[in-house]
From Swiss-Prot:
GO biological process: phospholipid biosynthetic process
Any one GO cellular component localisation term in the record: membrane
PANTHER family registered for this protein in UniProt: SERINE INCORPORATOR (PTHR10383), SERINE INCORPORATOR 4 (PTHR10383:SF5)
UniProt cross-references to Pfam families, sorted A to Z: Serinc
Family: Belongs to the TDE1 family.
Chief place of localization: membrane
Keyword annotations: Lipid biosynthesis, Lipid metabolism, Membrane, Phospholipid biosynthesis, Phospholipid metabolism, Transmembrane, Transmembrane helix
UniProt-recorded name of the protein: Serine incorporator 4
Origin: domain of life: Eukaryota
Subcellular location: Membrane
TM region(s), chain numbering: 59-79, 113-133, 148-168, 179-199, 219-239, 254-274, 281-301, 330-350, 421-441, 464-484
Lineage of the species this protein comes from: Eukaryota, Metazoa, Chordata, Craniata, Vertebrata
Biological role: Incorporates a polar amino acid serine into membranes and facilitates the synthesis of two serine-derived lipids, phosphatidylserine and sphingolipids.
Length: 492
């Protein structure tokens, strides 16, 4: 997780280059030039980053680029100004007749285009996830599929997107829509698991230090106060911006309910019956969850359609950020951009952390990450950097202090993160981005401008449900040990 650093080995070609001295210097340049299409790692010419970081960065850039293209194709303003087409970009009639035998062809913009681009990126990552399953060593030939052949992989990705555009709407939408919904919900659950594991690991880590040194107790207190302050300020701003004395009853009820959830989870975190089974349970983890609940509440309220009431013979729009008087309101695009930015940052966080934990704890990382107990505290406030071997499993370790560049590395024996898990997380992320941009269940008339400014009830209730799922998940983590009365509690 954040703060944990990785030491990875250099590629085989670089190791041979160092051993053979001058001869390798002549051969190294052609190999570096061919690395985009060949098996030589692209990072052989990148001495400031490790191979794993370079590969991960490039995949992130590919995903960001694909998501940006989806936004442009979904934007009615961009389509009208760039292509001058008010009803979307049409496929050339000659190509359309050749592929489909008629003039009824898929539109190259709008929600259909988003579905097709995301279908290409999702298939791209799913295929790599399958091909890289049970890969644990960077020296395995299959690791080159992840770290090399960049030009070929880019062409393959473009080819998948082109093939998706050749599929008629009636064949694509019915099945792919439900696949996207299932993948989107799965990715939401993955995010919730990660944020609860993040909160619990941070709390266990620093509470372990607080039991040994008072300075750690000060850090726990300051962090707890900081998160509760952010949650409180967020709640006040939400009441001020998204409620009105003459309306917005649903917003008021939702905010009040979620504040009650935060209070309930905080009380349970320090309840004596909970602390007997979980001595390290405390307000730090509850404050992090409370802060995340307020973010999910903001995300839900900013995604709902505005409320309109009649006052003195005039229609007035309420429940939008900005003015709190009985005056016409306009959508605030800055709030939409801020919400979209946080959403995508959470997407990238989930993809990277899931791949790291999958390699650190193995296939059952979702369960093992909650059971891990820290033996000594670390300034790194999240997950363990080293997991001891258990029942014959291999040991996986991360360096906590520095990351040595490739020029001074010894070849690593294990991956710093799970390549297969990384691609599967991006497969789910592609589906999540697809359904989020197209308003989940109401994708037919989706437009970028409406998605982030006018909202939809489908998106609103999905985000409310994700908030309630977060509450239930954390509540289950607190109460689950009580269901096993004969289990021994770990030492504080």
């Amino acid at each position: 997780m954040m703060g944990a650093k990785v030491v990875t080995g250099r590629s085989t070609t670089q190791g041979l280059a160092q051993q053979h001295g001058g001869v390798s210097n002549v051969v190294e340049t052609p190999f570096n030039q061919a690395s985009c299409c060949g098996p030589v790692s692209w990072t052989s010419g990148c001495h400031s980053l490790t191979e794993s970081r370079c590969s991960r960065l490039l995949y992130i850039l590919l995903h960001v680029g694909a998501s940006a293209i989806c936004c442009l194709l979904l934007s009615k303003t961009v389509v009208e100004r760039v292509w001058g087409k008010a009803h979307g970009i049409q496929m050339p009639s000659v190509l359309c007749a050749h592929l489909f035998g008629s003039s009824d062809c898929p539109v190259l913009s709008g929600s259909g285009a988003v579905y097709r681009v995301c279908a290409g990126t999702a298939t791209f990552h799913l295929l790599q996830a399958v091909l890289l399953v049970r890969l644990h060593s960077p020296t395995n030939p299959r690791a080159q599929l992840h770290n090399s052949f960049w030009s070929l992989k880019l062409l393959f990705l473009l080819g998948l997107c082109v093939v998706a555009f050749c599929i008629p709407d009636e064949d694509l939408f019915p099945a792919w829509h439900y696949i996207g919904i299932c993948g989107g919900f799965t990715f939401i659950l993955l995010q919730l698991v990660l944020i609860t594991a993040f909160a619990q690991s941070w709390n266990k880590n620093w509470q372990t230090g607080a039991a040994q040194d008072c300075s750690w107790l000060l850090g726990v207190s300051l962090a707890t106060l900081g998160f509760y302050s952010m949650a409180g300020v967020g709640a006040v701003l939400l009441f001020h911006q998204y409620t009105h004395p003459d309306g917005c009853l649903l917003n008021k009820m939702l905010l009040s309910l979620h504040l009650c959830f935060c209070g309930l989870l905080s009380l349970l975190s320090i309840a004596p019956c909970i602390r007997r089974k979980q001595p390290n349970s405390g307000l730090l983890q509850a404050s992090i969850i409370s802060c995340y609940i307020m973010y999910l509440t903001f995300s839900a309220l900013s995604s709902r359609p505005p409320e309109t009431i009649t006052f003195q013979g005039q229609n007035h729009t309420l429940c939008l950020p900005g003015r709190n008087k009985m005056e016409p309101q306009i959508p605030d695009t800055s709030v939409a951009v801020f919400s979209a930015g946080i959403m995508y940052a959470c997407v990238l966080f989930a993809c990277n952390e899931a791949s790291y934990l999958a390699e650190l704890f193995g296939p059952l990382w979702i369960i093992k990450v909650y059971k891990y107990e820290f033996q000594k505290p670390s300034v790194c406030f999240c997950c363990p950097q080293t997991v001891e071997p258990e029942d014959g499993q291999r040991s996986r370790a991360r360096s906590a202090d520095q990351e040595t560049p490739p020029a001074a590395q010894v070849q690593s024996q294990h991956l710093s993160y799970s390549y297969s898990g990384f691609h599967f997380a991006f497969f789910l992320a592609s589906l999540y981005v697809m359904v989020t941009l197209t308003n989940w269940f109401s994708y037919e008339e989706a437009e970028l401008e409406k998605t982030f400014t006018k909202g939809s009830w489908a998106t609103f209730w999905v985000k409310v449900a994700s908030c309630w799922a977060c509450v239930l998940l954390y509540l289950g983590l607190l109460l689950a040990p009580l269901l096993a009365p004969h289990s021994e509690s770990p030492p504080p």
